[in-house]
């Protein structure tokens, strides 16, 4: 708990960084939202039929519109695939800068009270660019393990399903499928948790071996499951709770005009900002945990608060 509390204070001290990341996310969203809005306003031909959608989903209206203007809309949807790839790249790219920020704050904790470490964008971008290559290799390693476990669970699920399908009812077959899906979900989240801790190890040791860092992180997580994976699941539940709250609010709001559309937009942006904050908070918590937990493998190089974070600490002092 103390690591989460410390990381939360450091996250609050890094609100300019959180705002920068949120701004980049907003820009990416607008790159699709604006063309989509332009396409819809052009293709609707000022039809009043679309007003029916304010009172709830109307399949007939949507189906007629897609039959008439599906090609134009699908062209915009093609941008979504590129947006997802860009967002994925941005997520990996920004990780180095986020970790550098927490390393900077951790190295300056011994300063006199009242002194604060100012966020500097140029140092943040330097951290992003310095670690992006090795973090992408680590992303590839994590994805490889996720795909392998997915194939393994799929094969086991098919074998078990075919063995019980002849003797069990449809409901029981679905139950077996849900059990294997839950096992796959737990395995995947465990691998993603290990991947996040591997990022910290790569950063801390200034290392380049993605497989080696993943192995070290795996041993670290498995030896401290409640403090690592357990806490990771708590953060997932917090994020899930935020989405559930949004859907509850959306169901309660009657979107019947521009005012309510604006209110819903604000609620959505608050949700996105909270998701960004939660991601930064988790990385800070994981960084603090790695610094405090006993290491399963003897470190090869000196612990890194990175040349960049060391230089920034000297400048702040």
How should each PLM-predicted stretch be described?
Residues 160-176, 207-214:
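Membrane-interface interhelical connector segments
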Residues 73-88, 119-150, 171-185:
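Alpha-helical membrane-spanning segments of integral membrane proteins, especially the hydrophobic core
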Residues 102-103, 215, 314-317:
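Polar-ligand-bearing catalytic/cofactor-coordination segments
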Residues 38-43, 150-166, 249-253:
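Membrane-helix interface motif
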Residues 129-141, 221-234:
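Loop-to-transmembrane boundary segments
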Residues 2-71, 94, 175-209, 225-317:
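Juxtamembrane transition segments at transmembrane-helix termini in multipass membrane proteins
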Residues 92-129:
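Hydrophobic transmembrane alpha-helix segments characteristic of membrane transport
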């Amino acid at each position: 708990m103390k690591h989460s509390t410390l990381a939360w204070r450091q996250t609050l001290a890094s609100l300019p960084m959180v705002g920068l990341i949120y701004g980049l996310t907003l820009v990416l969203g607008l790159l699709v939202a604006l063309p989509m809005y332009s396409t819809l306003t052009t293709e609707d031909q000022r039809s009043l039929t679309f007003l029916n959608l304010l009172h709830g989903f109307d399949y007939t209206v949507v189906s007629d519109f897609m039959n008439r203007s599906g090609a134009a809309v699908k062209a915009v949807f093609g941008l979504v695939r590129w947006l997802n790839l860009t967002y994925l790249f941005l997520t990996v790219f920004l990780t180095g800068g986020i970790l550098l920020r927490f390393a900077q704050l951790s190295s300056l904790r011994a300063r006199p009270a009242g002194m604060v470490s100012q966020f500097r964008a140029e140092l943040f971008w330097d951290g992003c660019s310095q670690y992006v290559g090795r973090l992408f290799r680590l992303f590839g390693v994590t994805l490889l393990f996720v795909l392998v476990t997915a194939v393994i669970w799929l094969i086991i699920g098919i074998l078990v399903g075919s063995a019980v399908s002849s003797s069990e009812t449809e409901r029981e077959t679905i139950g077996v499928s849900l059990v294997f899906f839950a096992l796959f979900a737990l395995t995947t989240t465990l691998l993603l948790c290990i991947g996040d801790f591997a990022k910290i190890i790569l950063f801390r040791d200034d290392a380049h071996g993605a497989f080696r860092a993943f192995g070290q992180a795996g041993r670290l997580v498995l030896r401290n499951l409640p403090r690592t994976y357990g806490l990771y699941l708590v953060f997932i539940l917090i994020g899930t709770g935020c989405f559930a709250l949004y859907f509850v609010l959306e169901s309660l709001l009657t979107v019947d005009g521009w005012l309510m559309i604006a209110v819903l937009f604000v609620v959505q942006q608050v949700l996105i900002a909270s998701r960004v904050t939660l991601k930064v908070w988790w990385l800070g918590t994981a960084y603090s945990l790695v610094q405090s937990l006993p290491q399963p493998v003897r470190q090869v190089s000196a612990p890194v608060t990175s040349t960049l974070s060391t230089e920034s600490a000297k400048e702040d002092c």
